[in-house]
């Protein structure tokens, strides 16, 4: 991760040859941006990157530049070592569509990792998609049919994170500090559509919503001190909600 917000978005550099200031674009001007251990970046860096994610543009000096399409950000953070980190505010975390938890590799996978590192094997990575193909795929995903009953199911799930007592989940009321925002509903719908697309269906079914619910919601639910004291996780809360909310 860059040490300065100017390193991320870019800055104005003085050219002695031309005696003018020229724009030097930062690494954010890419189709795919990897922000490694984002919670170790200072707040100003996080803010610069997340603003770029939201606005799809950055301002350098007096000029505003559109970011390339598609623009995707993958951020990582180490959940174990938290010393010297800068936790992302809830409003910024909410801008990430998904939070995917990566566990230890499986036995065969770890053997492959050892083999590649010991032998010095280089991965032969070949592109399988072009940028314009991803853009076209996104258009198709947005055409996947989302029935009103599925819409209500999505909204009910998100509302249950805010008002669990209204969904016969009174035991969660004191466990949830805050629930999902409207972005949670939007991204749950988009992720369900994407999952249906991957499954080669032109319509969303409840199983699509359930399949992506944990990844969409786990970082959007704030736990109370009582929940943390009880060792309850946001994943467990999502599971309880999915088991309780009526499936269409």
Where are these regions (language model features)?
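Short, small-residue-biased leader/transition segments that mark boundaries at the very start
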Residues: 1-3
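Conserved C-terminal "switch" segment of AAA+ ATPases
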Residues: 99-171, 198-202, 206, 227-229, ...
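Conserved AAA+/SF3 P-loop NTPase catalytic/coupling segment centered on the Walker-B
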Residues: 27-54, 68, 83-92, 104-112
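C-terminal engagement/docking regions of AAA+ P-loop ATPases
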Residues: 164-248
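Conserved RecA-like P-loop NTPase ATPase core
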Residues: 8, 36, 49, 76, ...
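AAA+/SF3 P-loop NTPase mechanochemical coupling elements
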Residues: 21-31, 60-77, 88-97
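Short glycine-rich substrate-engagement loop in P-loop NTPases that contacts/grips substrate
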Residues: 5-32
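A short beta-strand-to-loop transition that corresponds to the Sensor-1 phosphate-sensing loop
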Residues: 37, 71, 75-80, 102-105, ...
């Amino acid at each position: 991760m860059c040490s300065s917000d100017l390193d991320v978005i870019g800055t104005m550099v003085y050219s002695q040859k031309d005696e003018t200031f020229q724009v030097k674009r930062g690494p954010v001007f890419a189709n795919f941006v990897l922000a490694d251990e984002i919670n170790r970046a200072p707040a100003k860096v996080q803010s610069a990157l997340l603003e770029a994610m939201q606005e799809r543009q950055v301002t350098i000096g007096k000029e505003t530049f559109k970011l390339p399409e598609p623009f995707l950000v993958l951020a990582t953070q180490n959940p174990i070592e938290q010393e010297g980190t800068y936790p992302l505010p809830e409003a910024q975390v909410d801008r990430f569509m998904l939070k995917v938890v990566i566990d230890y590799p499986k036995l065969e996978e770890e053997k492959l990792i050892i083999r590649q590192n010991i032998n010095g094997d280089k991965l032969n990575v070949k592109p399988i998609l072009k940028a314009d193909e991803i853009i076209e795929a996104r258009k198709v995903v947005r055409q996947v049919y989302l029935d009103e009953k599925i819409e209500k199911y999505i909204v009910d799930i998100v509302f249950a994170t805010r008002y669990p007592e209204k969904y016969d989940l009174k035991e969660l009321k004191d466990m949830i500090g805050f629930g999902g925002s409207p972005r949670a509903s939007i991204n749950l719908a988009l992720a369900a559509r994407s999952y249906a697309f991957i499954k080669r269906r032109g319509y969303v079914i409840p199983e699509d919503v359930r399949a992506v619910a944990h990844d969409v919601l786990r970082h959007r639910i704030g736990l109370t001190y009582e929940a943390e004291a009880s060792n309850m996780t946001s994943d467990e809360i999502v599971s309880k909600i999915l088991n309780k909310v009526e499936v269409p």
